[in-house]
């Protein structure tokens, strides 16, 4: 996972 993927997941979870 890269930073962009993590950022997208965090946005979906919040």
Curated annotation (Swiss-Prot):
First-level EC class: oxidoreductase
Keyword Lipoprotein: no
Biochemical pathway: Aromatic compound metabolism; beta-ketoadipate pathway; 5-oxo-4,5-dihydro-2-furylacetate from catechol: step 1/3
EC number: 1.13.11.1
Stimuli inducing this protein: By phenol.
Reactions catalysed: catechol + O2 = cis,cis-muconate + 2 H(+)
BP GO terms, sorted: beta-ketoadipate pathway
Coiled-coil spans in chain: none
Molecular function as annotated in GO: catechol 1,2-dioxygenase activity
Keyword DNA-binding: no
Cofactor(s) the protein requires to work: Fe(3+)
Cofactor binding remark: Binds 1 Fe(3+) ion per subunit.
Alphabetical keyword list: Aromatic hydrocarbons catabolism, Dioxygenase, Iron, Oxidoreductase
Protein family: Belongs to the intradiol ring-cleavage dioxygenase family.
The name this protein goes by in its record: Catechol 1,2-dioxygenase
Organism: Acinetobacter calcoaceticus
């Amino acid at each position: 996972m890269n930073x962009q993927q993590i950022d997208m997941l965090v946005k979906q979870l919040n």
